[in-house]
């Protein structure tokens, strides 16, 4: 996600509070990337997360990391932060016959000529590695950003146009986020689907302890310039 300074969080009393936002980087800045991540990899069945407030004077987390376990035995790792600049987005999906890398808007395929397990078992050369083919996938540019989603939503209402992002898909990302928040606060592994009663109890307790921030001057309502296109 994009970097955030203390001035951003101090722009309104509700920002970065459990009562006002209900979460930090995971719920506010990270969901766009989490949407893509869970769309490609699906939901894990278990997470072990570490959430912390590292550089800001706020109630909620500004950084989160997690080890992920999937039903098929795969292991994943997730990290997000608003403490880094320059920021960026990087995602890898590794499989039996290669790897997909998505980095800062570019997509690359790394295709193995021999499946990794087969090469590992049959190769007799000490320092050999499987031959591979690399290619960058040119993705056709389309209208994107908030403007495109809002236009699509309006056209769905007016003309029954299929939604690009149906609301039900957001539930998957929210389940992922809730699991990391719960695991981070408990400091122990959490199963997915999340125990609803346990999560609700945690959020209610955090909201009770939540306090609105004191801000100097009027509340600022300025759109993130990254989302104006």
Where are these regions (language model features)?
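A general structural signal for well-ordered alpha-helical segments in protein cores
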Residues: 33-34, 146, 150-151, 177-178
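Short arginine-rich
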Residues: 176-186
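C-terminal glycine/acidic-rich active-site capping loop/insertion
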Residues: 70, 96-168, 190, 195, ...
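Predominantly a Rossmann-like dinucleotide-binding segment in NAD(P)-dependent oxidoreductases
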Residues: 1-57, 187
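Glycine-rich phosphate/pyrophosphate-binding beta-alpha loops
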Residues: 31, 56, 79-87
């Amino acid at each position: 996600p994009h970097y955030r300074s203390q001035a951003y969080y101090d722009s309104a009393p509700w920002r970065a509070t459990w009562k006002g936002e209900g979460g930090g980087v995971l719920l506010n800045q990270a969901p766009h990337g989490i949407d893509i991540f869970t769309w490609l990899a699906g939901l894990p069945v278990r997470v072990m997360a570490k959430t912390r407030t590292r550089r800001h004077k706020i109630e909620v987390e500004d950084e989160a990391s997690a080890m992920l376990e999937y039903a098929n035995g795969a292991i994943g790792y997730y990290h997000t932060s608003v403490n880094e600049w320059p920021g960026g987005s990087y995602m890898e999906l590794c499989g039996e016959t290669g790897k997909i890398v998505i980095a800062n808007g570019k997509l690359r395929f790394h295709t193995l000529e021999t499946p990794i397990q087969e090469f590992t078992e049959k190769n007799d050369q000490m320092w050999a590695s499987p031959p591979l083919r690399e290619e960058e996938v040119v993705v056709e540019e389309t209208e994107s950003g908030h403007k495109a989603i809002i236009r699509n939503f309006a056209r769905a209402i007016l003309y029954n146009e299929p939604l690009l992002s149906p609301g039900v898909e957001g539930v998957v990302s929210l389940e992922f986020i809730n699991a990391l928040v719960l695991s981070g606060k408990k400091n122990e592994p959490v199963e997915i689907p999340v125990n609803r009663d346990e999560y609700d109890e945690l959020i209610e307790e955090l909201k009770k302890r939540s306090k609105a921030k004191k801000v100097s001057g009027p509340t600022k309502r300025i759109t993130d310039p990254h989302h104006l296109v």
